[in-house]
Amino acid sequence: MQNSDSGKKTFLIGITGMIGGGKSTATKILEEMGCFGINADRLAKRYTEPDSPILIELVELLGSEILDEQGKPDRKKISEIVFNNPEKLSRLNQLIHPLVRKDFQKILETTAKGKMVIWEVPLLFETDAYTLCDATVTVDSDPEESILRTISRDKVKKEDVLARIKNQLPLTEKLKRADYILRNRGNIDSLREECKSLYSTLLGKML
């Protein structure tokens, strides 16, 4: 990815994987090594926060039941609705994704310009996000362990996690589509070694 107003190249790496599979951990390790991290979910989160700039649109799409006693959007209620209703999830994504993409482009053109950027995107291959990347990475993790980690981290039921997984491509398909694979089926030290090797490879591609 070449910046139009500068000869300095921004190298964009999209990273994805199964929910609870270690994407954020791998991203954090790569940030420690020198990458600039951008989390797509964090960018999207502001649009379902209590001070959401698209509150009216959210209520029109999902109903007033998503509001709490103070009239603010409740992210847990939103998740319960959309992850059990593919049509509403698709419409929510159509509403939020263009806004997130605009925020993302602004970061690329300012603070991330000329850097190796690791872009954490759960729906990297389900959307056109992968087409923007210079390289794509899928984190390979044990499915059952990933589910258990998500249950523990998010304090949700297994059926809720499975509903979210159902709205994504199978891990096997994400692995097929990726340029690189990060194995996360051991401890944190083994993942760190995987990240170190990947970083070295990608640095060579960038230079």
Swiss-Prot record:
GO terms for biological process: coenzyme A biosynthetic process. It holds the Pfam family CoaE. Keywords: ATP-binding, Coenzyme A biosynthesis, Cytoplasm, Kinase, Nucleotide-binding, Transferase. Pathway: Cofactor biosynthesis; coenzyme A biosynthesis; CoA from (R)-pantothenate: step 5/5. GO terms for molecular function: ATP binding; dephospho-CoA kinase activity. Its EC number is 2.7.1.24. It is found in: Cytoplasm. One of its GO terms (cellular component) is cytoplasm. It catalyses: 3'-dephospho-CoA + ATP = ADP + CoA + H(+). Residues 12-207 form the DPCK domain. ATP binds at G20, G21, G22, K23, S24, T25. Catalyzes the phosphorylation of the 3'-hydroxyl group of dephosphocoenzyme A to form coenzyme A. Belongs to the CoaE family. This is Dephospho-CoA kinase. It comes from Leptospira interrogans serogroup Icterohaemorrhagiae serovar Lai (strain 56601). The lineage of its organism: Bacteria, Pseudomonadati, Spirochaetota, Spirochaetia, Leptospirales.
